[in-house]
């Protein structure tokens, strides 16, 4: 669920880091359109696409099992859609960490005027 996803992000990037991704670029936060602005925004685009492929439960609400081991996110013995959601969130949190050097404060607080291009397909 979104709370667990936030905890993954904070676990990889430090306390309160999730706030940097709530409204960023064209895809981080609720909804999304246009072309991702940078590698960080692409992490959100890929995460949105991943959630879009989940069948059988609501990715924003479903509770799954995971832990941190040696700084790595490890999804637990989840079945079906819970496994899929955990993997979506794990991959995105790792993506944010791997691309933290691309984070651009100018893209915070996304604006629909910056995201008017035709949206990419998943």
Curated annotation (Swiss-Prot):
Tissues/organs with expression: Expressed by the venom gland.
Subcellular location, record wording: Secreted
This protein's UniProt keywords: Calcium, Disulfide bond, Hydrolase, Lipid degradation, Lipid metabolism, Metal-binding, Neurotoxin, Postsynaptic neurotoxin, Presynaptic neurotoxin, Secreted, Toxin
Swiss-Prot/TrEMBL cofactor(s): Ca(2+)
GO biological process, one term: arachidonate secretion
Catalytic activity: a 1,2-diacyl-sn-glycero-3-phosphocholine + H2O = a 1-acyl-sn-glycero-3-phosphocholine + a fatty acid + H(+)
Domain of life (superkingdom): Eukaryota
Protein name: Basic phospholipase A2 B chain
Organism in which the protein naturally occurs: Vipera aspis zinnikeri
């Amino acid at each position: 669920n979104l709370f667990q996803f936030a905890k993954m992000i904070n676990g990889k990037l430090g306390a309160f880091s999730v706030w940097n991704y709530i409204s960023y670029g064209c895809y981080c936060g609720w909804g999304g359109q246009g072309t991702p602005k940078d590698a960080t925004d692409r992490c959100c685009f890929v995460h949105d696409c991943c959630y879009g492929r989940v069948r059988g439960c609501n990715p924003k609400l479903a509770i799954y099992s995971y832990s941190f081991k040696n700084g790595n996110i490890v999804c637990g013995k989840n079945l079906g859609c819970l496994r899929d959601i955990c993997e979506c969130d794990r991959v995105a949190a790792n993506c944010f960490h791997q691309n933290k050097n691309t984070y651009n404060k100018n893209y915070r607080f996304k604006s629909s005027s910056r995201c008017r291009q035709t949206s990419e397909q998943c």
